[in-house]
Amino acid sequence: MAETFGMILDGRQVPALEGETFPVVNPANTDEVVGLVPRGGREDVRRAVDSALNALENTWWPKIYESRRRGRVLQRFAELVDARKEELARLLTREQGKVLKESIGELDSLINTFDYYSGFGGKLTGTVTYTRDGESVIKVETRKEPIGLCAAILPFNFPVSLYAWKVAPALMAGNAMLIKPASTAPLTDIVLTQMLHEAGVPAGIANLVTGPASSAGEELIRHPAVKKIALTGSTSTGKHIYAAAAEGLKHVTLELGGADPTVVCDDADLAAAAETIVRSGRFRNAGQSCTSVKRVYVFANVFDEFSRLVADQADRLRVGNGLEAMTDMGPLNNAQVREDVEHFLADALHRGAVLVAGGGRPEGAGYAKGYFLRPAVLIDVPPDAEIWHEECFGPVLPLMKVRDLDEGIEKANSSPYGLGSAIWSDSDRRIEEFVDRIQAGMVWVNYKPLSIPEAPFGGVKDSGIGRELGAEGLAEYLETKSIRRYVGKALS
């Protein structure tokens, strides 16, 4: 029988006020219900808000002089997660679908992120300077203060690492956090939020509500007490939240869609580029990543060789249940995502694209009840195919010939998105030209799409607003207050 999980309110798991639940199924076998979670609504969000406001008013957590103490709590949380990493990784794979080694990597990302932000304890310092106003001497101080109650809206693709990107800096800054996980992958986030309280976060500072976006989600983004919203999601969802936030002049951090391009030059290590793009760039997490490689522009004089290398690497990937040791790529997370990916593939083929690897649903008893797709590689994809212009959130990789770097950059910049980008080249001149001209928030050079706590993460154009990770990610959760104090008359 499936385990019943609760929302987290005041440090405890509680049911929804209406008492309803909904199932979370295993995307590798939809007959398996991994857990039942509360179907929260507007009133559940309101009581979570009241709980958080009470905690901000009556606990030590938001005090500007307690940052070292908060840092110790975050470090303790990272240690608790590390002790349960294998258990949590298996739960993550069962609810999300990704292979176990990727789930372990995601838990490592969370641990590293909380460890990184814990190091800001005692370092949230302001400034002091002196100036004069006529005959008066003025002491000018600044201090960093928490925003207050913040909301995190999480996606299904990386429910653990993106939890850390939002929750760790928000808590380090002294805020309270109201967390809404994705309905298809909320279970690990529920356990993590319970563990925050075990680590020493006061009751009410980290609450979690599960439920539909149409009710719980809407109340969350429109409630006047919520002062900041952090979302990872689609561009359309981000624009909706941005408009709602504007009504209350709320702070926002929006990490939205991406159609990340990679340019492969003729002086690149083609074998390394092909292996990295396939194994770490496009098909990791079944292609369900904002920063996965979604468009590849290859110099024409090496296109045939490179496309063969990519197709060979893709054909080697073993699709299956993420808990099985031999699996390289698990299922997609849900039926709608698979249908959307199949549409992109069908559209490209209808317009004349050539499939050189994979494609379609794998056959066999082990695949019948899961959301599986074979990794697909396409060449000769017409420029009007939808996959060049919209985000395909799954395992399809289109390759296009370009004459030179200039055309490659032009094609790369033709998308409305501007999240990540990459170049493979042995030429410093080419690399610097790409870095200077590419319209993207991030660039990877001869490497996989890597996210690390020390480096700010975010995009331009339709890929979002604000930055997560790094010192910039912490600044998104702080207000600056300035104090002008008269201290006496200036000497003449």
Model-identified regions with their sequence ranges:
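Residue-level signal for inorganic ion chemistry
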Residues: T30-D31, R70, L92, F114, ...
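Glycine-rich loop-to-alpha-helix module at the N-terminal edge of alpha/beta enzyme cores
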Residues: T30, V34-L124
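ALDH superfamily catalytic-core signature
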Residues: K228, S236-P382, V445, L491-S492
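Rossmann-like NAD(P) dinucleotide-binding subdomain of oxidoreductase/dehydrogenase enzymes
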Residues: G126-A272, V402
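Conserved C-terminal structural/oligomerization subdomain of aldehyde/semialdehyde dehydrogenase
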Residues: E32-G35, V226, V263, R318, ...
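Structural signal for hydrophobic packing residues in well-ordered secondary-structure cores
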Residues: L56, W60, A78-K85, A89, ...
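Short, well-ordered beta-strand elements within core beta-sheets of diverse protein domains
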Residues: V34-G40, N54-W61, A152, T262-C265, ...
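Hydrophobic face of amphipathic alpha-helices that form TPR/SEL1-like repeat modules
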Residues: M1-N29, A55
